C-alpha cells in the first residue's frame, strides 16, 4: 500500500499510529 507517502508526511512518527486507523488513506 502507499505507506511510503504516509511516512513522508509532516506527521512523521505519528503516521504509524494514524496508519492503523486509516490504512487506506
UniProtKB/Swiss-Prot annotation:
One GO term (biological process): regulation of smooth muscle contraction
Q: Name one GO molecular function term.
A: hormone activity
What InterPro entries does the record point to?
A: Neuromedin-U_amidation-site, NMU_C
Look up the record and report any one GO term of the cellular component aspect: extracellular region
- One Pfam entry for this protein is NMU
Localization, UniProt? Secreted
Q: Does the keyword Secreted apply?
A: yes
Keyword vocabulary terms for this entry: Amidation, Hormone, Secreted
Q: Where is the signal peptide?
A: none
Chain positions with Asparagine amide modification: 25
| Major localization class | secreted
Q: What does this protein do?
A: Stimulates uterine smooth muscle contraction and causes selective vasoconstriction.
What is stated as this protein's family in its record? Belongs to the NmU family.
Listed name of the protein: Neuromedin-U-25
Could you tell me which species this protein originates from? Oryctolagus cuniculus
Amino acid at each position: 500500500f502507499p505507506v511510503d507517502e504516509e511516512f513522508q508526511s509532516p506527521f512523521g512518527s505519528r503516521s504509524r499510529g494514524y496508519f492503523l486507523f486509516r490504512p487506506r488513506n
